[in-house]
Regions:
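Short, hydrophobic beta-strand segments
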Residues: 96-120
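Short S/T/G/P-enriched beta-strand
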Residues: 2-91, 120-123, 128-147
Length: 147
């Protein structure tokens, strides 16, 4: 049968540029992080898990999310938010209250966290796939990012 996974051809699992690299389509490879101001003192942060071709996966995935004082994502912030809840996906485990979480995305590979911070403290939002501990870090969140 040649190259196969569970009796199926690899062609069924690969697409686009990922196929030329031998990477499986639909396998979590990266996290895209975006944000938007919400209601007063709230920022909504959305995490989309993509495959190596940059296509959002169509299945749940686990990601680690934390707030950091460092642009590199090193360590958690010393100034935690008031609350962090999930409006899309779910929080599976709180490592450090309002600073570090394990999140499961929705069936569309998306999670949105609602962060409330009355002090609007500056911190970086970071996320990593369990299979790749290198953090994805977005810009410094500050007063202007909150509602």
């Amino acid at each position: 049968m040649g190259n196969c996974i569970c009796g199926r051809s690899l062609d069924q699992y690969t697409s686009g540029a990922a196929a030329t690299l031998g990477v499986l389509a639909g396998v979590p490879a990266a996290i895209v992080i975006t944000h938007a101001a919400g209601a007063a003192n709230i920022v909504n942060i959305t995490f989309t898990v993509n495959d190596a071709a940059g296509v959002a996966i169509a299945k749940p995935a686990f990601i680690d999310v934390w707030l950091s004082d460092a642009a590199t994502g090193l360590a958690i912030t010393s100034h935690v938010a008031d609350t962090i809840t999930a409006s899309v996906g779910s929080v599976w485990h709180v490592n450090t209250a309002a600073a570090s979480l394990k999140v499961q995305t929705s069936a569309a590979g998306v999670a949105t966290l609602v962060v409330t911070d009355t002090h609007k403290t500056a911190w970086y939002t970071c996320a990593a796939l369990g299979i790749d501990p290198r953090p994805n870090v977005i810009h410094l969140m500050a007063t202007g990012d909150f509602g």
